[in-house]
């Protein structure tokens, strides 16, 4: 038996803004979009092999208090050309939370925030270098 992440869900303030953001930044494709009861809207976007579920409960919904939420801390998005992806996202106005860094040889990361406040991690990991860093205990995060 095998497992894989099928989708990740983000609660949106404005589903239109969120769809536009993921299309512009990552070339996401809208696979399904529905209006559901109780002013709820839902959209499934495909980015690579992963589905992103966007949910908008409308203006009457109360936001989740982040101090009481212990769930997902960020969503990792992989790339095979870190420098080109970073330049592309920067040119598109990405809200980076710092500069790119290399926590171990062969691993490059940078964090950014999407319009709803969710944290995204742009990552490029060389599998052999990553495993070597784990084996040697040199991963410094």
Per-segment meaning from a language model:
Residues 9-11, 76-78:
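Short hydrophobic/aromatic beta-strand micro-patches
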Residues 18-23, 89, 117:
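Conserved active-site tyrosine of GNAT-family acetyltransferases
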Residues 21-22, 26, 96:
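Conserved hydrophobic/aromatic "anchor" residues
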Residues 122:
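Short glycine-/small-residue motifs
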Residues 1-5, 29-76, 87-113, 126-141:
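Vicinal oxygen chelate
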Residues 82-86:
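Short, conserved charged micro-motifs
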């Amino acid at each position: 038996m095998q497992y894989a992440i099928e989708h990740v869900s983000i609660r949106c303030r404005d589903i239109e803004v969120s769809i536009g953001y993921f299309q512009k930044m990552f070339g996401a494709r809208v696979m399904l979009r529905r209006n559901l009861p109780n002013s709820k809207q839902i959209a499934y976007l495909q980015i690579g092999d992963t589905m992103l579920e966007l949910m908008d409960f409308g203006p009457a919904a109360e936001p989740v208090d982040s101090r009481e939420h212990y769930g997902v801390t960020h969503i990792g998005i992989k790339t095979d050309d870190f420098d080109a992806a970073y330049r592309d996202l920067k040119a598109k106005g990405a809200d980076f939370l710092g500069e790119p860094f290399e926590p171990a040889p062969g691993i490059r990361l940078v964090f950014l925030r999407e319009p709803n406040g969710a944290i995204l991690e742009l990552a490029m990991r060389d599998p052999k270098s990553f495993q070597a860093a784990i084996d040697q205990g040199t991963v410094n995060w």
